[in-house]
Curated annotation (Swiss-Prot):
Residues 3-245 form the ABC transporter domain. ATP binds at residues 40-47. The gene is ecfA3. This is Energy-coupling factor transporter ATP-binding protein EcfA3. GO terms for molecular function: ATP binding; ATP hydrolysis activity; ATPase-coupled transmembrane transporter activity. It comes from Oenococcus oeni (strain ATCC BAA-331 / PSU-1). Keywords: ATP-binding, Cell membrane, Membrane, Nucleotide-binding, Translocase, Transport.
Length: 288
């Protein structure tokens, strides 16, 4: 699903003495099937963008085109409800939304509310557990008996069961251990490769560099820069100005370069860093 913002502005508590401008004349494009990350400091407007895309908030000015749906200040609730069937929104600490006695009951809650027969909903639940790499035996477990990473995957499965075209991720791996983080991000990468459009808000620059096709940098409610990971993270003076951290692999490669190690710093992640270091050692070995 392609998404286009055109001159979008939004204020919280509009027309009150407490009105706060969250977005100011923002325009950008998110290509269909892309993995786009939105970064910036607290208060820059990142989460507001996600809520506008989902129709939880309505633009004060401008419009948003999401697939065949357009959202503007005149959009109504019925129109937005139809659109939201195409969108999956995974919030921070999404496992806190689990409330049923068993994993199966949690998973089928949404489909049943949309009129899906219970038998069909249960079959969907079995299939979606496989997508998030959990065994079918988990269906009868209580979410309270699962680890934090497993609960997060169940929460993600409860969104994926409706097969949304668009996934909105708000700090999706916050609070997880490194192993669980990798599993969750690899899951999103596979879903993206299968054609789902993904928009992620994150402070995890390693994940932003590793998985994104495009990065949108927000600053105080305005677009600061839009570019590929290579374009964003190669400009150190810009990163310092925006107070954005270099991904750890890129930072390590640049530190090696500074002390004379002949390494290509145009890398995205730790896997590429290790390959590049190994390559340079092999080159040095062949010279001897």
């Amino acid at each position: 699903m392609e998404i286009n913002f055109r001159n979008v502005s939004f204020s919280y508590q509009l027309n009150t003495p407490f009105s706060t401008a969250a977005l100011k004349d923002v325009s950008f494009d998110i290509p269909d099937g892309s993995f786009t990350s939105i970064v910036g400091h607290t208060g820059s407007g990142k989460s507001t963008v996600l809520q506008l895309i989902d129709g939880l908030l309505i633009p004060e000015k401008g419009h948003i085109q999401a697939g065949s749906f357009q959202m503007n200040s005149g959009s109504n609730a019925k129109h937005l409800k139809k659109f939201r069937k195409n969108v999956g929104f995974i919030f921070q600490f999404s496992e806190n939304q689990l409330f049923e006695e068993t994993v199966e009951k949690d998973l089928i809650f949404g489909p049943k509310n949309f009129g899906v027969e219970e038998k069909i909903a249960k079959e969907k639940a079995r299939k979606v557990l496989k997508i998030v790499n959990l065994p079918e035996s988990f269906l009868q477990k209580s979410p309270l008996d699962l680890s934090g990473g497993q609960r997060r995957r169940v929460a993600i499965a409860s969104i994926l069961i409706s097969d949304p075209q668009l996934l909105l991720l708000d700090e999706p791996v916050i609070g997880l251990d490194p192993g669980s983080k990798d599993e969750i991000m690899n899951l999103f990468s596979r879903l993206n490769q299968q054609g789902k459009t993904i928009v992620m808000v994150s402070h995890e620059m390693d994940d932003v560099a590793d998985y994104s096709d495009q990065i949108i940098v927000l600053n105080a409610g305005r677009i600061s820069k839009v570019g590929s990971p290579e374009e964003i993270f190669s400009d150190e003076s810009y990163l310092r100005k925006e107070k954005l951290r270099l991904p750890s692999a890129i930072d390590f490669a640049k530190q090696l370069k500074k002390v004379g190690f002949p390494i290509n710093v145009s890398i995205k992640n730790k896997r590429e860093l290790l390959r590049e270091i190994k390559k340079q050692f092999e080159i040095e070995k062949d010279k001897k």
